[in-house]
Amino acid sequence: MAWRALHPLLLLLLLFPGSQAQSKAQVLQSVAGQTLTVRCQYPPTGSLYEKKGWCKEASALVCIRLVTSSKPRTMAWTSRFTIWDDPDAGFFTVTMTDLREEDSGHYWCRIYRPSDNSVSKSVRFYLVVSPASASTQTSWTPRDLVSSQTQTQSCVPPTAGARQAPESPSTIPVPSQPQNSTLRPGPAAPIALVPVFCGLLVAKSLVLSALLVWWGDIWWKTMMELRSLDTQKATCHLQQVTDLPWTSVSSPVEREILYHTVARTKISDDDDEHTL
């Protein structure tokens, strides 16, 4: 069964000793470019830590180690392989990224004794990696990977004496970076607009300042012109008021001289008429 693109494969494998585990291989199928995640469960052991390993079978007697854990709850990785072990929960997780067709073959989940580093428990399975088709080579983002549901397959060989480990969540999101991936724009786009906004604010501030200076200059000139007109009107009015006494008021001496002149003229006229 070929898994759909963007969905990593999650397997639950129960490790146990014995020849029966060596004779059976769980068949797994995946597609090139995808990520394979295998969760190998085992019964909790004693106080001494037992290393966990992931190896690829080269022959009936040789298994090449790809990655090995070093201590509990610490991720170890080599190339495209990572491993994470949690002895308290009773499982360890192995991840293969960027699957290739040449990755097809037999693999082993193994537990090694701390004394002589020999294999104490193991499970064997066979992986088939098919070439990616045009329909599966689609762009993706980490958001798609998190939001999608991970398919789960349980591969537990039937045994009478095998003790089942406590159940744990069937889905563990494992970040991967497949080839030909296209990332969507993130928060970098708004950050790139910050200089543009700052430039607009500075330009608006400069224009506003220029308008204020221009308006202040016009207001000042207008006020000076109004003050100049008020000063000219006040000077003209004062001059008119000052000239009034000279044109409307005459002294008593002038009025007396004017009176005598008129009287003499009248008397002279009367004398002429009488002579005639």
UniProtKB/Swiss-Prot annotation:
Residue ranges annotated for the Ig-like domain, each copy included: 22-120
Any one Gene Ontology BP term: cellular defense response
Topological category with respect to the lipid bilayer: Single-pass type I membrane protein
Family statement drawn from the similarity comment of this UniProt entry: Belongs to the natural cytotoxicity receptor (NCR) family.
GO molecular function, one term: signaling receptor activity
Residue ranges of the TM segments: 193-213
Carbohydrate-modified residues: N180
UniProtKB keywords: Cell membrane, Disulfide bond, Glycoprotein, Immunoglobulin domain, Membrane, Receptor, Signal, Transmembrane, Transmembrane helix
Keyword Transmembrane: yes
Gene label: NCR2
Region feature Disordered, mapped onto this chain: 138-184
Extracellular side, ranges: 22-192
Tissue expression as described in the entry: Selectively expressed by activated NK cells and by in vitro cultured (i.e. activated) TCRg/d lymphoid cells.
Cytoplasmic topological domain: 214-276
Disulfide bond entries: C40-C109, C55-C63
A GO term from the CC aspect: plasma membrane
Gene3D superfamilies: Immunoglobulins
Name under which the protein is recorded: Natural cytotoxicity triggering receptor 2
InterPro entries the UniProt entry points to: Ig-like_dom (IPR007110), Ig-like_dom_sf (IPR036179), Ig-like_fold (IPR013783), Ig_sub (IPR003599), Ig_V-set (IPR013106), Immune_rcpt_domain (IPR052314)
Residues in the signal sequence: 1-21
Subunit structure: Interacts with TYROBP/DAP12. Interacts with KMT2E isoform NKp44L.
Compartment(s) of residence: Cell membrane
Organism: Homo sapiens
Residue ranges with Polar residues bias: 138-156, 167-183
Chief place of localization: membrane
Stated role: Cytotoxicity-activating receptor that may contribute to the increased efficiency of activated natural killer (NK) cells to mediate tumor cell lysis.
Keyword Transmembrane helix: yes
